[in-house]
Amino acid sequence: MGARASVLTGSKLDAWERIRLRPGSKKAYRLKHLVWASRELERYACNPGLLETAEGTEQLLQQLEPALKTGSEDLKSLWNAIAVLWCVHNRFDIRDTQQAIQKLKEVMASRKSAEAAKEETSPRQTSQNYPIVTNAQGQMVHQAISPRTLNAWVKAVEEKAFNPEIIPMFMALSEGAVPYDINTMLNAIGGHQGALQVLKEVINEEAAEWDRTHPPAMGPLPPGQIREPTGSDIAGTTSTQQEQIIWTTRGANSIPVGDIYRKWIVLGLNKMVKMYSPVSILDIRQGPKEPFRDYVDRFYKTLRAEQATQEVKNWMTETLLVQNSNPDCKQILKALGPEATLEEMMVACQGVGGPTHKAKILAEAMASAQQDLKGGYTAVFMQRGQNPNRKGPIKCFNCGKEGHIAKNCRAPRKRGCWKCGQEGHQMKDCKNGRQANFLGKYWPPGGTRPGNYVQKQVSPSAPPMEEAVKEQENQSQKGDQEELYPFASLKSLFGTDQ
C-alpha cells in the first residue's frame, strides 16, 4: 500500500485531504482513494505510475474520457478522482470534486482555442511522409521511399507469402507512392519469382488496355507541354521520376499515375492470392470438435481470398456460414433465426464441442433415457409382453387414448371394470363377450386359449345332429306308409326280404 499511496507527499497530500468528495459533504479524499484509483487503472490496463505527474494524469483523463458516456459508475468515479488529482498537481485551489471538473473543462477549452488560432496563423505545410514534397523553393520534388518501409514490406512477404492480408499491407505502405517507388518495393522481393512473373503479365495486360483506350495525340507537341503517359509510362519502365511527378501534380488534367499503377498491382496480387490459397470457400467446414470461433476465422480468411463481388460474399456469409457448421452449432444457429448477428452467433456457440458442452449433452440424454424408462418404452415392453400377438399402438384402458398404458395415465381413475364399466369386478374377471371352457372358467382376457388347446375352431366333418334326427324321422314315416299299403307295389309279394 505504501508504494501506491506515495503518489502525493507533503503539501500536495495536505491539499488532497482537504478536498471534499461532494459539495457540502463532510467526507474528504484520503490515501485509500489513491490506492483504489491505482488498482482500477491496472484493471483497465492503464499505467498507475502516471498518477505521479500532472502530464500523466492529463494523459489518463484523455484516454478515459471517450468511455464516460457508456462507462459504469466506477469508471466515472475514477475519472473524477484523477481530475481532482490533476488539479492538485497543478496547484489549483479547489474545494470539491465539482470545482475540479469545472476547472479542468475551462483549461482544456482555452487550450483548444489557442491551438485553433495558432493553426490559422501558421502556413500550411505538406506532410514530409508524402513521397512528393515541396522543398524550400516551393518546387515539387520526390522523396525516396524509406528503408524502414522496404524492410516492413519484405518481412510481410516473407512471413505471409501472398495471403489475403498482403493486399491491405501493400496499400498502406504504398500510399501516395509513384511508379518508381512501387517498382522499388517489387524489386526488393527476393523469392516468389513465379508469382512475380504472374504479376508482370497482369501489368502488361493492363498497360495494353490503357494504350487501347488512351491513344496518343497525333502530331508534334507544343513547346513546354509534356506528353501524355502511356501504359509503359504508368508502369515506370519508360518514364522518369520528374515526369511521374509532373503528371501527378499538374493543376489541369492531372493523371495520378501512382494510383493507377497501384490498382494494376492489386489486380495481380488478387490472382497471386488465389494461386497461393487454392482452398474454396465451399470446402470450409467446421469439424466435429472445432470451436465455432476458429471455424469463423478460417471461413472469413478464405472468403477474403475469393474473387467475387461484395454482394456475392454477403450471400456466401449468410448461407454457407450456417450450412457448413457442425450439427451442434447448426441446431443452435437455426434456432437464432436468419437475422442473428455474428456476435450473437459466436456467443450462442461458445463452448460447443468442449468438455462442458459434452457433459451437458450427456446429462440431457441420460435424463431423457430415465424418463423413457419411467414411462413410455417400459410400458410398451410390459404391455406387449403380455400379448405378443397384439398389433398396432398401445392403448390406455383408463382414458382410451393411444401412446401410454393405464399405469401412467394422468386422467382421473375409472371406477369399476375398464371393459364393460360395471362395478363389482375387475377387467380380468369380466364375462362380457367371453366364452367359458368345459370347466366353467373363462378364457384369458387377451382372447387366446391355453397352449394345450387348439387355437383355431375345428369344423366337424359329420352333419349336424338336427339333420340326422330329421333324416331318421323321414325314414320312419316312410316305413309306416309301406305297412299301411302292402299291395301298392310288387315288393309286398316277397315281404321284407327284398
Swiss-Prot record:
Renumbered residue ranges of the record's region Interaction with host CALM1: 8-43
Keywords tagged on the record: AIDS, Capsid protein, Host cell membrane, Host cytoplasm, Host endosome, Host membrane, Host nucleus, Host-virus interaction, Lipoprotein, Membrane, Metal-binding, Methylation, Myristate, Phosphoprotein, Repeat, RNA-binding, Viral budding, Viral budding via the host ESCRT complexes, Viral nucleoprotein, Viral release from host cell, Virion, Zinc, Zinc-finger
PTM (free text): Gag-Pol polyprotein: Specific enzymatic cleavages by the viral protease yield mature proteins.
GO MF term (any one): zinc ion binding
Gene3D superfamilies for the chain: 1.10.1200.30, 6.10.250.390, Human Immunodeficiency Virus Type 1 Capsid Protein (1.10.375.10), Immunodeficiency lentiviruses, gag gene matrix protein p17 (1.10.150.90), Single helix bin (1.20.5.760), Zinc finger, CCHC-type (4.10.60.10)
Region (Dimerization/Multimerization of capsid protein p24): 276-362
Region annotated Interaction with Gp41, chain positions: 7-31
Domain remark text: Late-budding domains (L domains) are short sequence motifs essential for viral particle budding. They recruit proteins of the host ESCRT machinery (Endosomal Sorting Complex Required for Transport) or ESCRT-associated proteins. p6-gag contains two L domains: a PTAP/PSAP motif, which interacts with the UEV domain of TSG101 and a LYPX(n)L motif which interacts with PDCD6IP/AIP1.
Name of the protein in question: Gag polyprotein
Upper taxonomic lineage: Viruses, Riboviria, Pararnavirae, Artverviricota, Revtraviricetes
